[in-house]
């Protein structure tokens, strides 16, 4: 793994996304600028934390961060642009939503969207960079809550459990009930359920 060197600037934003793989709902991104004077203990990749710990850190990040923002790309944008370009758009929206302009942006993964400030992609950044860990927590808690709300409207799909990922249960529900307006119609399992697969 390439050695990561933290940038020598004051205002560093971390950016991460949640929801590239699911068949339903938005891809949700977050951008976070942490306050060095108010450290947050226990930041890590959101997927490695218990739900209880994630929720506690979510509240602490929102309280202590200098700035945080959400960005999203909706299913119709994912279908129009493709998931990669929609994710980049959502990241741009998250950074643009920060009320303090960052001097540098660190992004989880291996590519950066076009941004008006210097940026760097950090592979496994959600485990290596506190700002990206914080962004991953904000994005995951937000998207999980959206999936729980969608589950209340469409209980037959099990969204609260699988968060929209293509589990056997979700695929069976798609086959039985068809797709909702929240499904990503460009994704192969949804296409098949709609009879659009070639």
From Swiss-Prot:
Gene: rnhB
Keyword Endoplasmic reticulum tagged: no
Transmembrane region(s): none
Residues that, per the record, bind a divalent metal cation: 16-17, 108
GO cellular component terms, semicolon-separated: cytoplasm; ribonuclease H2 complex
Cysteine pairs bridged by disulfides in the record: none
Protein known as: Ribonuclease HII
Any GO BP: mismatch repair
Major place of residence: cytoplasm
Top enzyme category: hydrolase
